[in-house]
Regions:
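Alpha-helix capping/helix-boundary segments
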Residues: 24, 59, 98, 117-118, ...
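Acidic, PIN/NYN-like endoribonuclease modules and their adjacent C-terminal/linker elements
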Residues: 1-17, 119-147
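Short active-site oxyanion
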Residues: 50-53, 90, 126-129
Length: 147
């Protein structure tokens, strides 16, 4: 079960951060291209609490999609990867609390991670609900089916 980030650094803390694109994180996790993997390891291993890497919500969503579709990661592996990223002191994840909530929903349901993230983002924005034409998102991610 992922943490409920509280003391996680945020972009507003005045840290010297670098943004990480999805492909850098993918290379770091999969080691499928020797040269790019070496470069990704060099950058990510140099991160610290004072100079963390930043993962945007888009990178997190794209990472899940790439790992599922291109690398055939199982749901349990996706949950483990995201849980590890959320717990890392060397990473700042945009809206980490929403990512953690979406991960909990994803882990416990049949919903896609992106649907869980969309629904949790709507809740965080104080939406009454999120409408969708996707039957699975409505039944599994807590959205309202639009007919």
């Amino acid at each position: 079960m992922p943490p409920s980030p509280g003391a996680h650094p945020s972009p507003d803390d005045g840290l010297e951060m670098i943004g990480l694109d999805t492909n850098v994180v993918v290379r770091y996790l999969t080691h499928d291209d020797a040269a790019q993997t070496a470069a990704a390891i060099r950058v990510i291993d140099a991160l610290s609490q004072d100079s963390p890497g930043f993962l945007s919500l888009i990178v997190v969503a794209e990472l899940v999609w790439v790992l599922e579709v291109s690398y055939r990661f199982k749901k349990s592996e996706i949950v483990q990867v995201l849980d590890t990223l959320l717990r890392s002191k060397e990473l700042v994840i945009e809206r980490a609390e929403i990512v953690a909530q979406a991960l909990r929903n994803f882990s416990a349901s049949r919903a896609d991670f992106a649907d869980c993230l969309i629904e949790r983002s709507g809740k965080a924005a104080e939406c009454q609900y999120t409408v969708t034409f996707d039957q699975n998102a409505a039944s599994s991610a807590g959205m309202k089916l639009l007919r």
